[in-house]
């Protein structure tokens, strides 16, 4: 009954130090781009900005060419917010419906071992449905002029548009319910939702070394680094997403919705996935605010925290969109993001305000770099610009920075049992970044470090391919000669780094990036081949992932 009601409600409502050949770049120029426009009657027709259109864009299916689909969506500024955001979602769903369909089967299998919505646990479906209904109730009872609630409405309109656009383009055999489409957009939140709704109780249950290692390997999401060059000539960022390899159907997106309610965050360039309105890597460039966002996830090791998660909150995805669109600095972004905290996708968000950076400056302006770490029931945030200045870099690697968050999430228990592997200061990635950050002077250096995995020879990796910047848990690692069980490695599976992205100061101004899709390839790590994991869902994906870095210019 709830799903039926839900559907009724929906109706209501570069100058750089690296080189890339022309074949390794992505641009919207050239005859290979076919634009489509959306009319005010929500009909999709060929052509760019045809008379009477309210949105236009293109999608380039280049997954097998260089690893990435590329999507560009732009709306007019003269229609209502509801129409503009619904139009952006609709055109995205329409143009990328095949990718969404292909992605969805692997996505649902990775969480539920089935792609059949009828076989997904009822408790999970109920949570998702209740959450959407809760947001609808809050929106309908809230101010129509408050900027925060305007953007909540806009995000929901965009989600509805995505659903309607998908089904308008997909054939009869490929139709999806709203709940299915919404669950895809909940990718960042879904791990915690599934744990909450499928676990009998949420009491603290100590894990042995094998159990906690597998949990960290399969939920630890990403590595990132912000680097200030030694002469302060550049401020660079690089990030690798860690995930299940079955989600490696990727889209780089540029979304521009220049309505009056988004004076600081009308346009975003970000790495993403089919059917998602957010990045969830996360790796954003936003203008005109010139904010850059990236993050890594902090795994919940204290299961009692799940008692504080419920459907009556705003999930990560919607809080992310709202903060991106309203904030003009790091403090504002953090303040907006933590409102109505769901306690799902508990990440360390890193917010870099490029407006405040001047190359070759002798000091950094305060508020240049903010971080926030949320957890179920709370958060901590701070301006860490001084730390960036003193260290020369800001690393992030699935360990809470704030001591309070570290304690609440349950890390001290495992530090006491298993040592430095679980610490913020001395885990393998922390050690590698501390040793190597001073060598990072160019964009190419950032590309190299975020791809880094020399587990056979790097002492900090201790012989395990999961202990590096760009993990490869699909490659077996061995025990140390000492046989110490604390440093023996258990987990082996299709998880790890699935990409690389990087930007520098000039790229923020040109609204470009460089990116690579797929597990890292190094002298110690051969190209990933699905032949080695044929039983894992990987429909429609390239058989071998050996893509190089490309320039993103959408």
Curated annotation (Swiss-Prot):
The entry annotates sugar attachment on 113, 140, 231, 302, 340, 546
Where is this protein primarily located?
A: secreted
Q: Where in the cell is it found?
A: Secreted
The record's Gene Ontology biological-process terms are:
phosphatidylethanolamine catabolic process; phosphatidylinositol catabolic process; phospholipid catabolic process
User: Which keywords are on file for this protein?
Assistant: Glycoprotein, Hydrolase, Lipid degradation, Lipid metabolism, Secreted, Signal
Signal peptide range in chain numbering: 1-19
The Enzyme Commission number assigned here is 3.1.1.-
GO terms under cellular component: extracellular region
Care to name a GO molecular-function term for this sequence?
phospholipase activity
Query: Among its keywords, does the record have Signal?
Result: yes
Family, per entry:
Belongs to the phospholipase B-like family.
What functional role does this protein have?
Answer: Probable phospholipase.
UniProt name for this protein: Phospholipase B-like protein E
What is the protein's species of origin?
A: Dictyostelium discoideum (Social amoeba)
């Amino acid at each position: 009954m709830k799903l039926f009601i839900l559907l009724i409600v929906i109706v209501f409502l570069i100058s750089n130090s690296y080189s890339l050949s022309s074949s390794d770049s992505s641009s919207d120029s050239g005859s290979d781009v076919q634009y489509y426009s959306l009319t005010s009657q929500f009909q999709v027709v060929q052509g760019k900005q045809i008379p009477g259109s309210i949105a236009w864009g293109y999608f380039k299916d280049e997954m097998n060419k260089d690893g990435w689909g590329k999507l560009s969506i732009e709306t007019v500024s003269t229609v209502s917010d509801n129409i503009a955001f619904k139009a952006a979602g609709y055109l995205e769903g329409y143009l990328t419906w095949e990718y969404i369909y292909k992605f969805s089967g692997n996505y649902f299998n990775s969480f539920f071992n089935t792609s059949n919505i009828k076989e997904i646990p009822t408790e999970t479906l109920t949570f998702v449905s209740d959450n959407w209904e809760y947001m609808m109730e809050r929106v309908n009872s809230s101010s129509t002029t408050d900027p925060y609630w305007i953007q909540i409405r806009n995000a929901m309109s965009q989600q509805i548009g995505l659903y309607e656009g998908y089904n308008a383009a997909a054939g009869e055999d490929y139709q999806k319910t709203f709940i299915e489409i919404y669950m895809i957009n909940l990718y960042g939140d879904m791990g915690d939702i599934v744990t909450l709704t499928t676990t009998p109780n949420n009491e603290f249950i100590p894990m042995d070394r094998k159990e906690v290692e597998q949990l960290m390997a399969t939920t630890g999401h990403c590595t990132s680094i912000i680097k200030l060059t030694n002469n302060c000539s550049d401020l660079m960022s690089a990030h690798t997403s860690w995930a299940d390899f079955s989600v490696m159907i990727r889209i780089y997106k540029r979304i521009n919705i220049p309505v009056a309610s988004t004076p600081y965050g009308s346009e975003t360039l970000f790495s993403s996935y089919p059917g998602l309105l957010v990045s969830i890597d996360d790796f954003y460039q936003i203008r005109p605010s010139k904010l850059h966002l990236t993050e890594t996830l902090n795994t919940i090791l204290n299961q009692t925290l799940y008692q504080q998660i419920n459907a009556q909150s705003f999930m990560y995805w919607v809080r992310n969109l709202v903060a991106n669109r309203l904030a003009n600095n790091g403090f504002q972004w953090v303040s907006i993001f933590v409102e109505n905290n769901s306690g799902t996708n508990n990440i360390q968000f890193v917010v870099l305000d490029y407006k405040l950076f001047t190359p070759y400056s002798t000091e950094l302006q305060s508020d240049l770099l903010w971080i926030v770490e949320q957890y179920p029931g709370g958060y901590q945030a701070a301006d860490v610009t001084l730390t960036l200045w003193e260290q020369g870099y800001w690393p992030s690697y699935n360990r809470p920075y704030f001591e309070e968050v570290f304690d609440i999430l349950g890390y001290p228990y495992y530090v006491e049992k298993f040592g430095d592997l679980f610490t913020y200061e001395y885990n393998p990635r922390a050690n590698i970044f501390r040793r190597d950050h001073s060598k990072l002077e160019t964009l190419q250096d950032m590309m190299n470090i975020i791809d880094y995995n020399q587990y056979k020879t790097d002492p900090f990796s201790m012989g395990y391919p999961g202990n590096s910047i760009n993990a490869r848990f699909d490659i077996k690692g061995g025990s140390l000669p000492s046989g110490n069980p604390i440093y023996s490695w258990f987990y082996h599976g299709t998880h790890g780094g699935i990409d690389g992205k990087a930007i520098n100061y000039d790229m923020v101004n040109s609204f470009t990036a460089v990116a690579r899709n797929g597990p890292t390839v190094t002298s110690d790590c051969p190209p990933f081949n699905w032949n080695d994991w044929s039983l894992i869902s990987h429909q429609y994906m390239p058989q071998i992932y050996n893509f190089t870095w490309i320039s993103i210019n959408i």
